[in-house]
Amino acid sequence: MEQSLHLEIISPDHTIVSDRVTYVNLPGVNGELGILPGHIPLMAALDIGKLHYQQDSKNYYVFISAGFAEVSNNKVTVLTEAAEKASEIDVARAQAAKERAKARLLKAEEDIDMARAEAAMHRAIIRLNISSL
């Protein structure tokens, strides 16, 4: 059995990762999905969260917005609206987004879209958590 699989993380404007890896953990909408070489074919909806993969015994982390994953023939393809490697997350920008979302949530006006503010807060917190890994 092959000891690695090919991981591609693709957003509309560029490919974030395209490499051989030994393990991938995806943030599925129904929970985390662990993918090893030889995994059966799979299509999965992804939630906003942390994608984790291993390469040469090193751990790597990527923030992804919601998207889809396809697993087939030792290849994992992730299609997402946005993705950032942990090392590329702008912590100041993520912190500012968190503060803006917090301010909107504290402002109890009817014209505030609470679901959007909560989603923005959730994204910012995940990005900040991933940036420290």
UniProtKB/Swiss-Prot annotation:
A single Gene Ontology CC term: plasma membrane
Superkingdom, natural source: Bacteria
Location of the protein in the cell: Cell membrane
Single GO MF annotation: proton-transporting ATP synthase activity, rotational mechanism
UniProt keyword Ion transport, yes or no: yes
Keywords: ATP synthesis, Cell membrane, CF(1), Hydrogen ion transport, Ion transport, Membrane, Transport
CDD domains hit by this protein: F1-ATPase_delta
Keyword S-adenosyl-L-methionine: no
Topology of the protein relative to the lipid bilayer: Peripheral membrane protein
Function text: Produces ATP from ADP in the presence of a proton gradient across the membrane.
Matching HAMAP family: ATP_synth_epsil_bac
Subunit note: F-type ATPases have 2 components, CF(1) - the catalytic core - and CF(0) - the membrane proton channel. CF(1) has five subunits: alpha(3), beta(3), gamma(1), delta(1), epsilon(1). CF(0) has three main subunits: a, b and c.
Family: Belongs to the ATPase epsilon chain family.
Protein name as annotated: ATP synthase epsilon chain
Organism whose genome encodes this protein: Lawsonia intracellularis (strain PHE/MN1-00)
